[in-house]
């Protein structure tokens, strides 16, 4: 596996961040006393939040750091697979449509942050790892790479 690069879908392989994101949106709406109606697409939602709340990312970071343990837990089999791949020379990147702050906190709580070289959008991860990076969208796909 030396020379292999993998681009892992955070939500499909390591940790589903959607419940944490949805809880934060609900909490933020309550705190600012404004009904935050944001698109389901998180990239579009970020733009809407920029307009509605201004500097909302620190609020998300604090909330996610505090609440992530409620939704995100390490998966021993997945983490063992990642450790084995990295030990064999595989480069690992993680992509998500979640804001980077949320993605990095999710990775830490999933126990996978040390194995990951780059976090970002799929385009950013592919640029960092090289265009030949194999996209992995599920734990089953990851298990098949062993």
Regions found by a protein language model. Name each.
Residues 1-2, 86, 100, 104-146:
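Asp-based, Mg2+/Mn2+-dependent phosphohydrolase catalytic module
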Residues 2-76, 101-104:
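N-terminal helical cap/lid subdomain that shapes the substrate entry/recognition surface
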Residues 60, 69, 81-108:
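Substrate-recognition element of Asp-dependent hydrolases with the DxDx(T/V) motif
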Residues 78-83, 126:
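Short amphipathic alpha-helical segments and helix-helix/interface helices
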């Amino acid at each position: 596996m030396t020379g292999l690069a993998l681009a892992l879908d955070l939500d499909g392989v390591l940790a589903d961040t959607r419940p944490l994101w949805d809880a934060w949106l609900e909490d933020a709406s309550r705190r600012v006393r404004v009904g935050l109606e944001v698109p389901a697409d998180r990239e579009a939602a970020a733009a809407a939040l920029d307009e509605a709340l201004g500097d909302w990312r620190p609020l998300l970071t604090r909330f996610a750091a505090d609440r992530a343990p409620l939704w995100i837990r390490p998966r021993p089999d997945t983490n063992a697979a990642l450790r084995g791949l990295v030990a064999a020379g595989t480069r690992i990147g993680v992509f998500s449509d979640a804001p980077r702050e949320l993605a990095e906190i999710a990775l830490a709580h999933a126990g996978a942050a040390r194995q990951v070289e780059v976090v970002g959008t799929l385009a950013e991860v592919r640029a960092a790892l090289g265009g030949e990076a194999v996209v992995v969208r599920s734990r089953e796909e990851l298990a098949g790479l062993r």
